[in-house]
């Protein structure tokens, strides 16, 4: 990964106006933030800049307002939570450009923190419109991007600003990039990837990229059924994309060419209905009843997955192994996650995980603090796993 500048490269920023792109796209119900994780992740960058005397000006999007103001998507509603997390007063401007923003910035003292209104209230944000970028840049001397989760978008506040102002990575961005470099950029081998989830169709690029980079690819979740069916296994009524059999075969051929082992379930936990406490049984993967569906990988498969994790120096994980939301179909995901956490805590494994369902599954297993790094970035994490260039990251390595 090319070098990029971080906050460590910033000298004497007292009095400087620092535009900080953060991810504050948090879930809100009845006007209250229900999960402040994303705010907590960017707090260190904000507070470090403030403590050094910078005038910290926060840029963020919230929801999809489609280029015009929508009251329910105003960032004003999250100000109290941001203040609670930072333990620091913040002011709010009713626009991210124009007089409201300029006036609010002009009133700032050194160390103050200002949140500007939702950047997506303007069409220029998602279009990366040069005129809009210039209006944003007018309020800053320095640009810091701490929103890896939005780095796959070439928007005005994530990519355009880095062309106008000296650009640096914030602490969250820095930690994410360093963790991802350990995961797939320059990993210690052997590297094992676990990919689960419902559908192959949403992860074709990811799987094709991984088989060229990892030593073993463990496939679980509903997508394993598509690979099993492509191999000639009868998967009963299991979720399966039969029309992607040829794609699955191509991925397996590419894996063989690249020297990547494909690890598929040897047994499964099957049920006739997908409900909590449904009657279920463990069957060999070649003996799935015609009227049943596989909802989790079985204990023999779990032991195999744990053995692969034990052999690995690096683990990259995206997607659960089974329908973890409903017991007892969470057993395999929990067992594998706990084993990976134990190996990580023992200093034997670098473990990097990401993706919405993955984060939820690892939280469910109670091990989210025990992995080397868990990305909350969603789409950006997936595009990184697919081997795609992320505009918001690429510009940091070439910015003036």
Curated annotation (Swiss-Prot):
It catalyses: (2R)-3-phosphoglycerate + ATP = (2R)-3-phospho-glyceroyl phosphate + ADP. ATP binds at residues 203, 325, 355-358. It comes from the Bacteria. Its main location: cytoplasm. GO terms for cellular component: cytosol. Gene3D superfamilies: Phosphoglycerate kinase, N-terminal domain (3.40.50.1260). One of its GO terms (molecular function) is ADP binding. The keyword Kinase applies. Its EC number is 2.7.2.3. GO terms for biological process: gluconeogenesis; glycolytic process. Substrate binds at residues 23-25, 38, 61-64, 120, 153. Signal peptide: none annotated. It is found in: Cytoplasm. Keywords: ATP-binding, Cytoplasm, Glycolysis, Kinase, Nucleotide-binding, Transferase. Pathway: Carbohydrate degradation; glycolysis; pyruvate from D-glyceraldehyde 3-phosphate: step 2/5. Monomer. Belongs to the phosphoglycerate kinase family. This is Phosphoglycerate kinase. It comes from Agrobacterium fabrum (strain C58 / ATCC 33970).
């Amino acid at each position: 990964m090319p070098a990029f500048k971080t906050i460590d490269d910033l000298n004497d920023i007292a009095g400087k106006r620092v535009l900080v792109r953060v991810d504050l796209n948090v879930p809100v119900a009845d006007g209250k933030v229900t999960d402040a994780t994303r705010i907590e992740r960017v707090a260190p960058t904000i507070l470090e800049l403030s403590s050094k005397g910078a005038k910290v000006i926060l840029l963020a999007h919230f929801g999809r307002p489609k280029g015009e103001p929508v009251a329910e998507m105003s960032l004003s509603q999250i100000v109290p939570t941001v203040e609670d997390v930072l333990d620091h007063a913040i002011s709010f401007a009713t626009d991210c450009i124009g007089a409201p923003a300029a006036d609010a910035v002009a009133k700032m003292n050194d160390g103050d923190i200002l949140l500007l209104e939702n950047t997506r209230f303007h069409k220029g944000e998602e279009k990366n419109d040069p005129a809009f970028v210039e209006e944003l840049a007018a309020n800053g001397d320095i640009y810091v991007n701490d929103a890896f989760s939005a780095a796959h978008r070439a928007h005005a506040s994530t990519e355009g600003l880095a062309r106008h102002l000296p650009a640096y990575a914030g602490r969250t961005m820095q930690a994410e990039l360093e963790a991802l470099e350990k995961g797939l950029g320059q990993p210690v081998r052997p590297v094992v990837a676990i990919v689960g989830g419902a559908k192959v169709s949403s992860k074709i690029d990811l799987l094709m990229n991984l088989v060229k980079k990892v030593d073993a690819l463990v496939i679980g979740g509903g997508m394993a059924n598509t690979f099993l069916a492509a191999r000639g296994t009868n998967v009963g009524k299991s979720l399966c994309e039969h029309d992607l059999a040829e794609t699955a075969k191509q991925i397996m051929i590419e894996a063989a060419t690249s020297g990547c082992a494909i690890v598929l379930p040897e047994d499964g936990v099957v049920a006739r209905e997908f409900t909590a406490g449904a009657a279920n049984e463990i069957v060999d993967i070649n003996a799935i009843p015609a009227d049943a569906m596989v909802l989790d990988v079985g204990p023999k498969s779990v032991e195999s997955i744990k053995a692969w994790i034990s052999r690995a120096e690096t683990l990259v994980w995206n997607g659960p192994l089974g329908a973890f939301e409903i017991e007892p179909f969470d057993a395999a995901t929990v067992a594998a996650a706990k084993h990976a956490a134990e190996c990580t805590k023992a200093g034997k494994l670098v473990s990097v995980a990401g993706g919405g369902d993955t984060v939820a599954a690892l939280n469910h297993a109670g091990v989210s603090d025990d992995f080397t790094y868990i990305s909350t970035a969603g789409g950006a994490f997936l595009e990184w796993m697919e081997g795609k260039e992320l505009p918001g990251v690429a510009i940091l390595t070439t910015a003036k």
